[in-house]
Amino acid sequence: MGPAPRVLELFYDVLSPYSWLGFEVLCRYQHLWNIKLKLRPALLAGIMKDSGNQPPAMVPHKGQYILKEIPLLKQLFQVPMSVPKDFFGEHVKKGTVNAMRFLTAVSMEQPEMLEKVSRELWMRIWSRDEDITESQNILSAAEKAGMATAQAQHLLNKISTELVKSKLRETTGAACKYGAFGLPTTVAHVDGKTYMLFGSDRMELLAYLLGEKWMGPVPPTLNARL
């Protein structure tokens, strides 16, 4: 038997486009590196409040930079993202509380669907400029991910329960305890040590810490399979 897989925790919120990039890279490398990836839906607003930080898009110059950067990142990471037309009005102001509670419920009851449902919620915001705050739209994302309608409705009914609310607060709090000040935050547990890395552009450093090979955001072996 080889060495046990290193555990990586990925804290993310579907409001964050950079979380999507980090998510896709780690989902690709989980099949190439000796790692166990734990997806941990968290609430960006809670992390910002705890750390005293604010989202990059809320800083005017950073917001303008993001508009120019995302089309380039789309090509580099091969993730079908584009900036929503009214991101601040439609998505930032409405927030993602219900969507993240839904993902929390998925993680608790049907964790094998968490990757696919998370991806579909990102696709709605960051690829098709669609809403994820209304119940029917959350259901649509779950169904598109392959979840049965009855199960999706069951999980949607759970988002108002204290159990799910508490779990999301707990996960967000765990990220804060690690020192998170934004998302995505990746926590690597390596040889008894814990490393907290921020952003989707720390993957080469992560590979170094893991003793693994970094082959870019779209590894050649993945291209060969595709």
UniProtKB/Swiss-Prot annotation:
Consequence when changing S16A: Reduces catalytic activity about 30-fold. Reduces affinity for glutathione about 4-fold
Catalytic activity: RX + glutathione = an S-substituted glutathione + a halide anion + H(+)
InterPro entries referenced in this protein's UniProt entry, alphabetically: DSBA-like_thioredoxin_dom, GST_Kappa/NadH, GSTK, HCCAis_GSTk, Thioredoxin-like_sf
Annotated glutathione binding sites: S16, P17, Y18, N53, L183, S200, D201
EC number(s) reported in the record: 2.5.1.18
Gene3D superfamilies named in the record: Glutaredoxin
Keyword Transferase: yes
Keywords from the named record: Acetylation, Mitochondrion, Transferase
Assembly and binders: Homodimer.
Family under the similarity heading: Belongs to the GST superfamily. Kappa family.
Protein name: Glutathione S-transferase kappa 1
Organism: Rattus norvegicus (Rat)
Gene that specifies this protein: Gstk1
